[in-house]
C-alpha cells in the first residue's frame, strides 16, 4: 500500500495524505458477516462519560472477524477478497472455506486473492496459515497471537505489527513483541504467519480537524484552558502554568507514573520488559 498525496489547492490539502486503496478487491462487505455498531459518545450504560473526547463520526457496520480460527482445523479456504474495514487500521480478507462457510480474518502483508489458507497443527508455516506456536519455527514472524489458548488473538492485530518467535523452552515459546518486550507464551496458543498488512497506515496525515471528526474524535481540551472546578491545571489570569506536576483531571500524575500493579500474576511470563529493563 502506498500513501497518496494531493496538490495544495487549500491549506488543509497541503499536508493531507490518504491511503491508496488500489489493493482492495471488493467494495461492499459480506452482509452476513456484519452487524450494527451503535454509537456510545464515550458514555456507559448510566449515561456518564467514561472515555472523553469521543462522539460523532461516520456511521459504521462492524465486520465480524474470526480471531480464534481453531474450529476450522483441516478445512482449507480460498482468499476471495481483500476489503477495507473502518473499525481497524488493518485490511481484512474474506475467506471462502471448502465446506461453504465464509469468514473474515486480518489480511497479512503480501496475501493475494486466490491464495489457499489452512488452519491447525497440520498446516504448513506459510503466509496466512494459523497454527499453534509449538509448530512455528524459531525466527518466524507472526501476528494475531493468543495470550491464552482458545481465547482468541490479542497481540499484534493493528496495521504493520508483528511478533517474532525467539526461542522455545518446555511448554512455552519466547516471543519478541512490537514494544520490544520478550515474553513467554504457551505453546498451544495460536498465531498466524506473517505481519499485518497496510504498514503505511502510520504515515497517514489527517491534514485537517474535520477529518478527525469523521473518525469520531472530538477536540482534546487542555486542562490549562479550563476553570479550576474542571481541572487541577485550570484557572489563573491569562496563560499560566499548572503550578504543579502535570496531572490528569482526577489528580493522578500524568507523566512517568507506573500504573502496572505490583506482583501481577503475568510478571512471571515477562523475560525482558520493553526498553531492555
Swiss-Prot record:
The family database entries (InterPro entries) matched by this protein are listed as: NA-bd_OB-fold, Rib_uL2_dom2, Ribosomal_uL2, Ribosomal_uL2_bac/org-type, Ribosomal_uL2_C, Ribosomal_uL2_CS, Ribosomal_uL2_dom3, Ribosomal_uL2_RNA-bd_dom
Residue ranges with Basic residues bias:
210-221
- Entry GO CC: large ribosomal subunit
Q: Which Pfam families match?
A: Ribosomal_L2 (PF00181), Ribosomal_L2_C (PF03947)
User: Which Gene3D superfamilies does the protein's record reference?
Assistant: 2.30.30.30, Nucleic acid-binding proteins, Ribosomal protein L2, domain 3
Q: Some GO term, biological process aspect, for this entry: which one? A: cytoplasmic translation
Alphabetized GO MF terms: rRNA binding; structural constituent of ribosome; transferase activity
Q: Where is this region: Disordered?
A: 1-20, 210-277
PANTHER family assigned to the protein according to its UniProt record, in alphabetical order: LARGE RIBOSOMAL SUBUNIT PROTEIN UL2M (PTHR13691:SF5), RIBOSOMAL PROTEIN L2 (PTHR13691)
**Protein family:** Belongs to the universal ribosomal protein uL2 family.
Q: Which HAMAP family match?
A: Ribosomal_uL2_B
Question: What biological function has been recorded for the protein in this entry?
Answer: One of the primary rRNA binding proteins. Required for association of the 30S and 50S subunits to form the 70S ribosome, for tRNA binding and peptide bond formation. It has been suggested to have peptidyltransferase activity; this is somewhat controversial. Makes several contacts with the 16S rRNA in the 70S ribosome.
**Entry's NCBIfam families?**
rplB_bact (TIGR01171)
- Cite the record's note on assembly: Part of the 50S ribosomal subunit. Forms a bridge to the 30S subunit in the 70S ribosome.
What name goes with this protein? Large ribosomal subunit protein uL2
Q: Which organism is it from?
A: Deinococcus deserti (strain DSM 17065 / CIP 109153 / LMG 22923 / VCD115)
Encoding gene (name): rplB
